[in-house]
Every structure is written in structure tokens, then in C-alpha cells.
């Protein structure tokens, strides 16, 4: 859907553009100082972590302001309600590296961390098995085949509570924040996914903003983080010592 440029829309675009532009300038300066293309590497991850987390919060808050500007433009009322969680059975992709970092930072001290990682591993294996099956069968779009069939498996996100609500709502990535439905949750299930009864939709950002996001994320390329949430969190676990070092840096600066 193409949104009408209301004053609220324009202000939200200016905000998110400014947040991304400032962060890119900061990362560009670090890269120049380091004499390399990417700003963030294992050598300065711990040192830069506080700024990364600060930026991620600003980015997600700006996106929420964008949602506030565009959702009222939809003719049908959004039917999403707390405790539904049906969309949380999809395999979450397109998670930015700085969001993975913030997400892992918020769960790393949880007593359920090991269980979370085991569940992430199981779901990642399930998705890639379906992807391989689609490629072996020479389907037209193996990724779409894998995503649809993964949803059919009914595997809830490891971070969904028994109540159906999100257990990490405040730090959920933008890929989770952009998913909505104009139909009740009873139609956001596998049997209705590809039918007219399901009117779920994704709120996309303008292409120019997506390009800015890509420019910021490019500075994390040396970390080699996957774009899927589950496999990304598994990869983040390898940076545990960097998080511990960042804590020491913060403590020493107080």
C-alpha cells in the first residue's frame, strides 16, 4: 500500500531518516579511523556495544512512530489483539544485525537462555530442511515453499508465552512489528493463509529508507550474522565474551 503523505507521515519519515543518517555517519567515521570498509568487528564490538544498543532503540522507536502515522490510513480496522500470537508461528527473517545484538543482549542472562537457543536450533533446522526439500523438488520459489510449509508446522516462536503474548515485546525486531491483519486471528492460521479470508499484511518502509537501513547494516558484515532471528541468535551466542567485556567497560566508566 502506498501511503498518503500526511503531516504525521512526513514527520515520521524525517525522524527515521535522521536516525539512520546520523548512525551511518558515525559508523563511516569509525570505519575511516580503522582503515577498513566496515565499522564493527570483533575487535571493537564490546567498545561500541552501548552505542549500538542506543541506536537500535532509536531506530525501533522511530519505526513505531511511522506505524502510528500509516496504520490509520488503512480502511479496515486492525484486528490484532494481545494474546493472539498466530503470526508468531512464521519463520522470522530479515532481522538487522544491530537488532540481533540488542535482542541477544536482553535474553543472555535469562535462566531460560539454553532452552531458547535449543528451540532456535530446532526451528532453524526445520526451516532449512524444508528449503532443501523445495530445492530438491525444483519448486518455483524454494524460499516461499519453505516459509509456507514451516508455518503449517505450527511451531510457535520460542519467546511466545503460554498466554500467547510475546515475552520479549519491547525488544522484538522490526520484522515482527510490521505484521498486521485486517481479519480476526481465527483466519491467521495455516488453512486460511493463502485464502481471501486471511487479510494479513506487512507495513513496509519506503525504498529510500530501506536503502539507508542496508547502508547501516553493511557496517556489521564482518560479524557474519545471519538475517534469520533464530539462527542469528545462535550466532550471537558466540559473542558472549564481548557482552561481558562491554559490561566491564561500562562499570569502569561509572
What are these regions (language model features)?
Residues 1-254:
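Short loop/turn segments that flank or connect secondary-structure elements
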